[in-house]
């Protein structure tokens, strides 16, 4: 479990993670999903990262910084956080970004990692997600799986 990694490395409290159930509806199906939460520490040494990507508590993209820092490990973490396997490819939730930012991120994924991606409009007006196509899954898995916690392999469609 991710908690064990964080706890072993001194990134969180010793309090046992709280388990709760979330019911999600898709079409006519309602499924229960187990979720866990735990408290991580705040490290002042990481404050510069926060200041780089947040202004007045609002996330901002510094596109050149993203280009510089997005590597295989960062992509793995992005997918563990905001990615979801669709049965064929992976959808990355980018609905907090403008269309211009989403277009930049899509092109970055294509150029830097040689992934085939599309931009999809989601159910929220003027919001988009990035879809990594089925054709890119084998390559994507090969470059990010080494950086993923095994409990997150389901985000790649791996059981």
Curated annotation (Swiss-Prot):
SUPFAM superfamilies: Homing endonucleases (SSF55608). Its main location: mitochondrion. It is found in: Mitochondrion. Gene3D superfamilies: Homing endonucleases. The keyword Metal-binding does not apply. Belongs to the LAGLIDADG endonuclease family. This is Intron-encoded endonuclease ai4. It comes from Dictyostelium discoideum (Social amoeba).
